[in-house]
UniProtKB/Swiss-Prot annotation:
The lineage of its organism: Bacteria, Pseudomonadati, Pseudomonadota, Gammaproteobacteria, Enterobacterales. It holds the Pfam family Pyr_redox_dim. It is found in: Cytoplasm. The keyword Metal-binding does not apply. FAD binds at E36, R37, Y38, H39, N40, V41, G42, G43, G44, C45. This is Soluble pyridine nucleotide transhydrogenase. The gene is sthA. It comes from Salmonella paratyphi C (strain RKS4594). InterPro entries: Class-I_Pyr_Nuc-Dis_Oxidored, FAD/NAD-bd_sf, FAD/NAD-binding_dom, FAD/NAD-linked_Rdtase_dimer_sf, Pyr_nuc-diS_OxRdtase, Pyr_nucl-diS_OxRdtase_dimer, STH_gammaproteobact. It is an enzyme of class 1 (oxidoreductase). It comes from the Bacteria.
Amino acid sequence: MPHSWDYDAVVIGSGPGGEGAAMGLVKQGARVAVIERYHNVGGGCTHWGTIPSKALRHAVSRIIEFNQNPLYSDHSRLLRSSFADILNHADNVINQQTRMRQGFYERNHCEILQGNAHFIDEHTLALECHDGTVETLTAEKFVIACGSRPYHPSDVDFSHPRIYDSDSILSLHHEPRHVIIYGAGVIGCEYASIFRGMDVKVDLINTRDRLLAFLDQEMSDSLSYHFWNSGVVIRHNEEYEKIEGCDDGVIMHLKSGKKLKADCLLYANGRTGNTDSLALENIGLETDSRGQLKVNSMYQTALPHVYAVGDVIGYPSLASAAYDQGRIAAQALVKGEATAHLIEDIPTGIYTIPEISSVGKTEQQLTAMKVPYEVGRAQFKHLARAQIVGMNVGTLKILFHRETKEILGIHCFGERAAEIIHIGQAIMEQKGGGNTIEYFVNTTFNYPTMAEAYRVAALNGLNRLF
C-alpha cells in the first residue's frame, strides 16, 4: 500500500538552487513545499550576496564614470555618495527581486513555509516556526538547498562593531576612511573595488601569492595592475596572527610581523555550508569540514531520496549554476534520471571594477596540456563604442586551436565583460564544426558595439597563423 506523505518533495532553501528545484518539481506535477528560514524568499543570493553587492558595485561604478568623464570635468566638485545612500539603491533592487520571486511561487501554487527545519528521520522534518511553534511534515523526497555563510574563525570577534563579514558589511553603520579586507578571493576583490571607488583607503590581504589564481594569468595581472593604479595596497602571502577590535577601529597583527590599523575590517576568507542545524546525523548523512555534502551526477546524496544543490555542495558555488543544478535535480527526482546536465564550460563573472569574465581554458592550462593554441586580442581603447562611452580600459582575448580553429577559451577584462563573454560562449557550445573563430570574421556585427571586439580579436589571432 503506498505511503501517504504530506508532500511529494520538500525543498529546504529558496535561493537559486532551491528555486530551480521547486519550479522544476511543480512544473512536473509534484506537490512541493519550500522551507525558508528568512522572512522573505530569495536566499542569500537575493538578500546579502549576489544582488546587493552587484547593486552596490553598479552605483559606485556610475559615480566613478561621472567623476572621470571629461564632459563633466569643468564642474568644480566631485560627485560623492555615502555608503548608506548607495545601500538604499541596493534595498530597492532587493525588494523588486523578492516580490518577483514570491510571485513565481504563488503563480505555480508552491507552498512557502517559514522557519528553521531539521530532520527527525529519513522522511520527517521538524519545522520551528518564527512564532515559536513546532510542526512536523513528511515527504517522500527532499532537496537540500540551504546555501552557505561566511566562515568565522573562533579567534575573531565578529560581535565587535568594527569587524564585518560579507553578510554584515551590508549593514555598515559608519563611513570608513580606511578598510582592511582579509581574503583576496572573488568577494574580497569585489569589495576592494567598491570601497576604493568610494575613495576609501583599502589594504587587501591575500593569503596566496597572486590574485584569483584560477583566472588566466593576464586577467589576474590586469586586475592587480588596476588595483595598484587606483591605490589599493595588496599584501600577498600574508596571514593574520591576531585581530584586535578597538573603539576607533581594528588592528591586525600579521604573522610576518607587520601591524595594520583601519577604521574597520571586512573578513572575507572562506565560506561554510549551512548544514549544521539540519540534524543530518538523524538520517546518517555526513558533511565535510566545510559543512558541504557529497553528491553524484544527479545531485543525490548518500541517501537516494535526499538531493543537494548550490553552495551546500561546493564548487562551482555560482548562483547561475545552482539554479541549473536545482532544475536537473528536480528532473532526476521525478523521473529517476536526468537528461539535462551542467555544461562543461561554465562562465565565470567577477564583478570588480572593471569586470572580469572567463569561459573555457586558460593559457596556463593549454600550455600544460601541450595544446597548439594561438591568441587573438582586442583592446577596448581601439573600439569606437568604447571611445564613445569612455570605456577605454579593457581587453578581450580569444584562445583557439591553431589547426582546427576551434575556440578553446575566452577571457575578458573591462566594463560589461560578464555580458560580452556570452557571445563567445554561444559559439563555443556549437557542435559539428560550428565552434570556430572564423565565425567572428564571417558574421556582421552592429556598429559601433562592444561585441565588435570579437571580430577585432579574431582577425588579430588569425593573422598570427602561418
